[in-house]
Regions:
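Periodic aromatic/glycine/histidine/acidic cluster detector
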Residues: 17-77, 81-89, 93-101, 105-113, ...
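Sec-dependent N-terminal signal peptides
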Residues: 4-13
C-alpha cells in the first residue's frame, strides 16, 4: 500500500512540474477546420506550431521561439509518414536536412548553416539512385 501511495505521489509531483502550454488555433480552412495551431508558454511566447492537412492529419510541426522556427521540424505526407526532418535556429535552416519521396526513398540530404547549403549534398531519383552530388562552401 505504501508503494502505491508513493508511486501516486510521484506521478502527481511530476505532472505538477510539467510545463503547461496554452493551445490556440491560429488559422482555419474555409470550412472551419483547423489549419494551424500554436502553443504558448506561461510568458505568452509561442514555443511550438503544428500545421494540418484538411483531413486533420498533421502536415508539419516543430519548435518556435516567438515568431521564428527554432529546433527540430518535421513535415509529413498526407498518410502520416515523415517527409522531411530539419533543424532551425532563429528562423534559419541549420544542421542536417533530410527529405524523403512518397515511396520512402531518399530525395535529398545535406547540411545548412544560417539558411544556406553547406558541405556535401546528395540528390536521388525515385528509385533511390544517386542523381548528383554537390559540395558547397562552409
Amino acid at each position: 500500500m505504501k508503494n502505491w501511495f508513493l508511486l501516486l505521489a510521484m506521478v502527481f509531483a511530476f505532472a505538477a512540474c510539467t510545463p503547461r502550454l496554452e493551445e490556440k488555433v491560429a488559422e482555419t480552412y474555409p470550412d472551419g477546420k483547423t489549419q494551424k495551431t500554436q502553443f504558448f508558454d506561461k510568458k505568452g511566447t509561442c514555443v511550438k506550431e503544428v500545421e494540418y492537412y484538411e483531413t486533420g492529419q498533421v502536415k508539419m510541426e516543430g519548435g518556435m521561439k516567438g515568431d521564428k522556427r527554432d529546433g527540430e521540424w518535421k513535415a509529413y505526407f498526407p498518410d502520416g509518414r515523415v517527409q522531411s526532418i530539419g533543424t532551425f535556429v532563429n528562423g534559419l535552416r541549420t544542421g542536417k536536412a533530410t527529405v524523403w519521396q512518397s515511396n520512402g526513398n531518399l530525395l535529398q540530404e545535406g547540411y545548412y548553416k544560417e539558411g544556406r547549403h553547406i558541405g556535401h549534398w546528395k540528390w536521388y531519383d525515385e528509385q533511390g539512385n544517386l542523381l548528383r552530388e554537390v559540395d558547397y562552401p562552409e
